[in-house]
């Protein structure tokens, strides 16, 4: 089964002025596409060829893992943003954030710190463990919290290709822009599932 580059859940210019059309053209159309194409080449003729993406992530390593995880991480990341995003979470998610982190502001500060201070390429995550406890963490390169038994709720890509066109080396500005488009409905859906 060949994997395909999924369409973005919005138009290329829909996240402007926070994330530019040019960034999405390169990030989605070139970087994400390259992960999908490389993954398909690597799994061709192997037992992974018929496996679902999440199983490949759990069972593989090396190049297959890196490209499978980057495909999953990016697909998830696109849905973590919306042109109607930003603002604050509500309902059960807001309550869980308050209970775990003390307040939305404290959660945002912790997540922002995790994203801004992550050394090198990787991802900042809001996850839920098997006991339903929320946690902020960062992973290096293509790592995905699923490999540690944690459920991703939200992620911010902190690879330089995610922001260099728009903010050059100013990752904090990019992370601030990310907050303006966070898709809390998607995060809530992940929290409830």
Curated annotation (Swiss-Prot):
Keywords: Iron, Metal-binding, Oxidoreductase
The record's free-text note on cofactor binding: Binds 1 Fe cation per subunit.
Principal EC category: oxidoreductase
UniProt cofactor(s): Fe cation
Keyword Iron: yes
One Pfam family, short name: Sod_Fe_C
Reaction equation(s) it catalyzes: 2 superoxide + 2 H(+) = H2O2 + O2
EC number, as in UniProt: 1.15.1.1
PROSITE patterns documented for this protein: SOD_MN
Binding locations of Fe cation: 27, 74, 157, 161
Keyword Secreted: no
UniProt-recorded Gene Ontology molecular function terms: metal ion binding; superoxide dismutase activity
InterPro entries (UniProt xref): Mn/Fe_SOD (IPR001189), Mn/Fe_SOD_BS (IPR019833), Mn/Fe_SOD_C (IPR019832), Mn/Fe_SOD_N (IPR019831), Mn/Fe_SOD_N_sf (IPR036324), SOD_C_sf (IPR036314)
Function in brief: Destroys superoxide anion radicals which are normally produced within the cells and which are toxic to biological systems.
Subunit annotation: Homodimer.
Protein family (similarity comment): Belongs to the iron/manganese superoxide dismutase family.
Full protein name: Superoxide dismutase [Fe]
Species assigned in the record: Coxiella burnetii (strain RSA 493 / Nine Mile phase I)
